[in-house]
Amino acid sequence: MNTAIQAALDHVVQSLQQEGILPSDWNNNSTLTRTKDRSHGDFASNIAMVGSKAAGMKPRDLAEKILASLPEVADITKAEIAGPGFINFFLNADQRFAVLDQIQAQGQYYGQTQVNAEKKIQVEFVSANPTSSLHVGHGRGAAYGMTVANLLEATGAQVDREYYVNDAGRQMDILATSTYLRYLELLGQPLVFPKNAYQGDYVKEIAQSIIDKDGDAYVRSVADVYRNVPEDVQYAEELDSEGNKVVLSGDKEKHIDGLIANSQQLIGQGYRVFHQAALKAILDDIKDDLADFGVTFDQWFSEASLTQKIDEALQTLDQRGYLYEKEGNIWFKSTKFGDEKDRVVKRRNGQTTYFASDIAYHLDKLQRGYTHIVDIWGSDHHGYIARVKAAIDAMGYDSSKLTVLLVQFVSLWRGGEMVQMSSRSGQFVTLRELRQEVGNDAARFYYVMRKSEQHIDFDLDLAVSQSKDNAVYYIQYAHARICRMLEKANSTQMRFNQTQARQFANRLDLDAETEILAKLAAYPDILVRAANAYEPHQIGNYLKELAALFHGWYNEHKVLTEDVELTQARLLLSVNVQQVLRNGLDLLGVSAPEAM
């Protein structure tokens, strides 16, 4: 129905432009939305307020001209001006019941549209370094990215989900060397484990798997491994005034880099055994963890596969005049495209930078023919946006194709206290631990219930509580309640008959029932808005509101009554609520239980 109203308003704009009331180049960015207050009709447009300045008249005066030119719209009984210049549209009574037919006909597909059918979108998300298990921060990116992809697909887009595997960087070398040092320890070689190495027990498990397969084939003298390696960092026993460690001597970065270099030299090709064993073990763990979380990918893209693409990207930038040499390094002129400073893409030792890999990766994405590229990054990567967009423009592509969505950090709270989390020390709360504590449903739901750029305080106690304060429980309970109601009805002579029930829909004449019908009809619009804004929380909030309307109505009004017609009508309304709840929960990756 909103499509028909919008078409009528578009017709009015053309007429007013022809009459010279609105400029011929006026861009209509007004909105047509469902009203929250039934006394204001079913739909409201702000077109008169948006266009008043361009028309050079007061909003209400322009609204009168709009109404005078408005063609007849089927099933609209009246349109009137309200407040500062809103135009409210009222549906006839029969049209309010049309949503019941739409939901019954479309079932699990109700709400889905083809508004983004011409888009081919790649959504890259999580992309955590394969150096340890996923932590709760990665979990938010996983839930958010998967749900954004679901929403885009539900609005007709062709979507590819991709995980970028950072399998060629320094962190992988730190992990490989950490594994090698644990390997030496397990084979009886005493050593002082580096402070900057990966500390978790999983490193020992990977090392043991290599021992089980190859024995002591890679054992070398610890003295040789540590030969000429800069001193590791030494900290004072007491913290400074801000609670930070005080460095007395040494350098943890130079220390681990020295160990990496020595390990590579001493065991030669054997180093790859540790690198690949660690990569496979961690990546398999990540894949299993995400699959159990309901998060899947169409492609796992290896950074190591980009060698030739890096050369191609840098050659393209050079040919277009955007590279220069300074102090032995090769720099990209990113400041020409709005970045705050130029960026190194190749160091004087010939090694390309992580940024060079990023440029090559985005070149590869663009060459795959996507109309839109969506990158979902941790908020700490905010500074990378300008330089990546600069590189895209410099290579001759359109950086507006790239949308970067930042995901803020997550804090866990239990018993009113924040749960501490860190990484290399091995003392971090994993996604798997969170899922085991609160369940997949609560994790998937609460991870997306705020805008991605907003911090989340995840209340573990609330997430497992069985109360209306726990939104996911409240929504799921509404679904289960309807299942139980239908089961009870079908066990008696009040068995639900959909065809018969539709004949009695006009018995749904309570204000609460009219409100539920309007809320059901609003779902497709909410879905489109949520998809185009990359805001899954809009679906979550909608489901909370729909569940609240249903619970309130159910608690106040008996569904299974002695009146057969009324019972059938109310069961019909309940069944449609059930379907929409299930559809919305499915998009969020949350189950719709039949019993609770």
Curated annotation (Swiss-Prot):
<dbReference type="InterPro" id="IPR008909">
    <property type="entry name" value="DALR_anticod-bd"/>
</dbReference>
<dbReference type="InterPro" id="IPR036695">
    <property type="entry name" value="Arg-tRNA-synth_N_sf"/>
</dbReference>
<comment type="subunit">
    <text>Monomer.</text>
</comment>
<dbReference type="GO" id="GO:0005524">
    <property type="term" value="F:ATP binding"/>
</dbReference>
<keyword id="KW-0963">Cytoplasm</keyword>
<keyword id="KW-0547">Nucleotide-binding</keyword>
<comment type="similarity">
    <text>Belongs to the class-I aminoacyl-tRNA synthetase family.</text>
</comment>
<dbReference type="InterPro" id="IPR005148">
    <property type="entry name" value="Arg-tRNA-synth_N"/>
</dbReference>
<dbReference type="GO" id="GO:0005737">
    <property type="term" value="C:cytoplasm"/>
</dbReference>
<dbReference type="InterPro" id="IPR001278">
    <property type="entry name" value="Arg-tRNA-ligase"/>
</dbReference>
<dbReference type="Pfam" id="PF03485">
    <property type="entry name" value="Arg_tRNA_synt_N"/>
</dbReference>
<protein>
    <recommendedName>
        <fullName>Arginine--tRNA ligase</fullName>
        <ecNumber>6.1.1.19</ecNumber>
    </recommendedName>
</protein>
<keyword id="KW-0436">Ligase</keyword>
<keyword id="KW-0067">ATP-binding</keyword>
<dbReference type="GO" id="GO:0004814">
    <property type="term" value="F:arginine-tRNA ligase activity"/>
</dbReference>
<keyword id="KW-0030">Aminoacyl-tRNA synthetase</keyword>
<feature type="short sequence motif" description="'HIGH' region">
    <location>
        <begin position="128"/>
        <end position="138"/>
    </location>
</feature>
<dbReference type="GO" id="GO:0006420">
    <property type="term" value="P:arginyl-tRNA aminoacylation"/>
</dbReference>
<keyword id="KW-0648">Protein biosynthesis</keyword>
<dbReference type="InterPro" id="IPR035684">
    <property type="entry name" value="ArgRS_core"/>
</dbReference>
<dbReference type="Pfam" id="PF05746">
    <property type="entry name" value="DALR_1"/>
</dbReference>
<dbReference type="InterPro" id="IPR009080">
    <property type="entry name" value="tRNAsynth_Ia_anticodon-bd"/>
</dbReference>
<dbReference type="InterPro" id="IPR014729">
    <property type="entry name" value="Rossmann-like_a/b/a_fold"/>
</dbReference>
<dbReference type="Pfam" id="PF00750">
    <property type="entry name" value="tRNA-synt_1d"/>
</dbReference>
